[in-house]
């Protein structure tokens, strides 16, 4: 399996598969601004309970205080919704993945889009990023170049799926 993920709720990533001279996976990470914007939008759906709006307008997951606020918001949200509903609400999942993936991805995300490549023997390492929803949240796009005679060089297959699939088969 080239992609190793299913249709996602939050972590849907556009993956392009095309013919290449060798197997190579290129992962495009979101910028910090993109990540913080997504989290701010998710937080807009919840009551502020007297929260300082300055924090919400200037949220940055890199700051420990902001992550602590996000953890509190997440804990409140999972208490407010029955178990099964908490697991399918996109805003709650987004916050969960952002928090759980932060430590793994903080050095891979930059002010601008960051790109990492896995070539040849390292090719399959991309699956660890695309199959884990906590990491996949931080991905913007994936491009997979596959060596093969049967692939037309003018053909590109696009797939939009995610690691948090309800049916990863």
Where are these regions (language model features)?
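Globular "head" domains of long coiled-coil molecular machines
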Residues: 1-169
């Amino acid at each position: 399996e080239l992609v190793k993920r299913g249709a996602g709720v939050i972590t849907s990533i556009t993956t392009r598969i095309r013919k290449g001279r060798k197997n190579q996976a290129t992962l495009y990470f979101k910028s910090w601004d993109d990540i913080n914007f997504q989290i701010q939008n998710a937080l807009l759906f919840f009551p502020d309970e007297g929260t300082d709006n300055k924090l919400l307008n200037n949220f940055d997951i890199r700051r420990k205080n902001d992550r602590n606020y996000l953890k509190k918001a997440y804990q409140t949200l999972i208490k407010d919704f029955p178990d099964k509903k908490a697991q399918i609400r996109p805003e709650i999942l987004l916050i969960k993945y952002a928090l759980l993936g932060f430590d793994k991805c903080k050095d891979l995300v930059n002010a601008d889009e960051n790109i990492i490549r896995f070539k040849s023997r390292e090719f399959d390492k991309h699956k660890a990023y695309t199959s884990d929803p906590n990491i996949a949240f931080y991905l913007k796009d994936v491009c997979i170049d596959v060596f093969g005679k049967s692939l037309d060089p003018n053909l590109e297959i696009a797939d939009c799926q995610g690691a948090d699939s309800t049916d990863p088969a």
